[in-house]
Amino acid sequence: MKKQHDTIIVLDFGSQYNQLIARRIREFGVYSELHPHTITAEEIKAMNPKGIIFSGGPNSVYGEGALHCDEKIFELGLPIFGICYGMQLMTQHFGGKVERANHREYGKAVLKVENESKLYANLPEEQVVWMSHGDLVTGLPEGFVVDATSESCPIAGMSNEEKNLYGVQFHPEVRHSEHGNDLIKNFVFGVCGCSEGWNMENFIEVELEKIRETVGDKKVLCALSGGVDSSVVAVLIHKAIGDQLTCIFVDHGLLRKGEAEGVMKTFSEGFHMNVIKVDAQERFMNKLKGVEDPEQKRKIIGNEFIYVFDDEASKLQGMDFLAQGTLYTDIVESGTATAQTIKSHHNVGGLPEDMQFKLIEPLNTLFKDEVRVLGSELGIPDEIVWRQPFPGPGLGIRVLGEITEEKLEIVRESDAILREEIIKAGLDREIWQYFTALPGMRSVGVMGDERTYDYTVGIRAVTSIDGMTADWARIPWDVLEKISVRIVNEVKHVNRIVYDVTSKPPATIEWE
């Protein structure tokens, strides 16, 4: 990306939160990039960043397989901010002491600021932070002072202000840290001296140029589902290369109610794109017959999607690229070279080795909320930009266990009722994601004086900014009651409704 703005580099040491650090910085109007911990000091120097952040990670700095960085990075003279593992790595490098904690600390803790370094400027002396660590700094390196403590962590923050080196044992990038944003701001602006200058207009300008350079006079296929991500990808690429783009819409039978018809109307008629509709419902259902394992379902759906594209591409001339709506969160949840895998993602896993296309993923540095902003900037209607996040495997991972036509119909109809009532209640912009899922369990009920033994439908609704962390949504009881009554009365073979009150972490947003 052209350096028309200040940049903060984030080094990836494996934390599942590492993408959030870059995300928070971009919220401030400062560009941030995530790079592997193996990047060299020379490579960083060539990027001319204003500062460096070391992310957290699951390893121990003294353990076998510990991740390290090029030690010359410490000699660049740039401000460095170490978070959790990053602080421990800094401690080890400068001769301090890191040991295993007697009790691992996960969750909220009260931080007490002992030394108001630039990092804590204008912040309260006591604040709630999010801890997630099994090791502790027990001995400061020479030249460092203790900035903050907590009940279980005597050195929860440290600094060497002469060298612009800072470390914290907690995670300011996670929204559970109540002043985390302000603390990162203090590093970005107060320590590094950055100026605001990055926004979505910059991104569009640079990305359009990048797409044109990458594609040249070749042709691109776009996996269009009608969801936010694929819609924005399609419009962005169409804006860059026009009729060189062909969109293929695969109706795999795992879509929401009315979605297939809506996709064709919006993009073929509304945006005047070349959209080919493929009816592959029977093909997908045959492949998924008898399959219960969620990872296997994801892989099958991912593979079959690509095979369908292969079949369609063979009918077209000179298709070289496949466009996907892969986001930053997709990549981190599927694991990187350093991040531990949570689940394989539909845009990352399941791709066959002999795939005939080169991938083009213009959104893979953006978070979901940034994609919505991008969509609005591109002139995409609100009803698409604010559409509910919907996974590539569709309802296939909202039917737990084996997928059948009957179960799909239950999820499809119950989900339509949920969406309708949430919109009626004016909650559709407040709740980040909401859907129904079918856990596959049956229970006894009574309907019309008769005993029933039917399915339970689960409702999942969460509030979030970017999908990395989420809290369950406090939907008013009267709205939940309406939803419950309607689903039980209008959807066949359902006699019980449950509401998921689990946050992420420990749960993921989707049930599979």
Curated annotation (Swiss-Prot):
Active site: C84 (nucleophile), H171, E173
Coiled coil (UniProt feature): none
Statement: the UniProt record of this protein carries the keyword Nucleotide-binding: yes
Catalytic activity: XMP + L-glutamine + ATP + H2O = GMP + L-glutamate + AMP + diphosphate + 2 H(+)
Molecular function GO labels: ATP binding; GMP synthase activity
Domain named Glutamine amidotransferase type-1: residues: 7-197
Residues annotated as binding ATP: S225, G226, G227, V228, D229, S230, S231
Domain of life: Bacteria
Residues covered by the GMPS ATP-PPase domain: 198-387
Pathway field: Purine metabolism; GMP biosynthesis; GMP from XMP (L-Gln route): step 1/1
Keyword Protease in annotation: no
GO CC annotation: cytosol
Top-rank EC class of the record's enzyme: ligase
Keywords tagged on the record: ATP-binding, Glutamine amidotransferase, GMP biosynthesis, Ligase, Nucleotide-binding, Purine biosynthesis
One Pfam family matching this protein: GMP_synt_C
Gene3D superfamilies: 3.30.300.10, 3.40.50.880, HUPs
Cited PROSITE patterns: GATASE_TYPE_1, GMPS_ATP_PPASE
Residue intervals passing through the bilayer: none
Assigned EC number: 6.3.5.2
Assembly behavior: Homodimer.
Record's function text: Catalyzes the synthesis of GMP from XMP.
UniProt protein name: GMP synthase [glutamine-hydrolyzing]
Taxonomic placement: Bacteria, Bacillati, Bacillota, Bacilli, Bacillales
Gene label: guaA
